[in-house]
A protein has these predicted regions:
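PP2C/PPM-type serine/threonine phosphatase catalytic domain
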Residues: 1-130
Length: 130
């Protein structure tokens, strides 16, 4: 990654639902130096497996880095893809099953600018030296 992102572990373990990615070799113009970070915190339904989450992360990373245009357009494409994933999972549930829902924190560092999108209960703290 172009940016030095320190990842702090929670009780010595990776944070469940957190994912960070650097640009792929083939990406849309303007995405070369972008850093993508996602945090999905499931709020209801049976737990989504780590394998399913990883496949979602792989898919939306590809979508983000291949989407041309503004950073916010690429972020919107990621949010729409994740929402579609949740809808697909929920459509397969029985009537008695509790639907899946999740909070999302999505951040992109583009050059020296931080873009943040959030859905559901979440917060962002920006800390800097000085």
């Amino acid at each position: 990654m172009k940016h030095d992102l320190d990842l702090y572990l929670l009780h010595g373990e990776l944070i469940p639902g957190f994912y960070a990615a650097a640009s792929a070799k083939r990406c849309a113009r303007g995405r070369e130096d972008d850093s993508l970070m996602l945090l999905i915190a499931q709020t209801s339904g049976t737990p989504i497996t780590p394998e399913t989450l990883q496949s979602w992360f792989n898919r939306v990373t590809s979508i983000f880095y291949k989407t041309s245009g503004s950073v916010t357009a690429a972020m919107r494409a990621v949010v729409n893809a994740l929402n579609s994933n949740l809808i697909e999972v929920n459509l397969k549930l029985t009537e008695e099953a509790e639907p899946h829902s999740a909070a999302l924190s999505l951040a992109v560092i583009h050059h020296d600018t931080l873009f943040v999108a959030q859905s559901g209960l979440s917060q962002v703290l920006l800390l800097q030296d000085g």
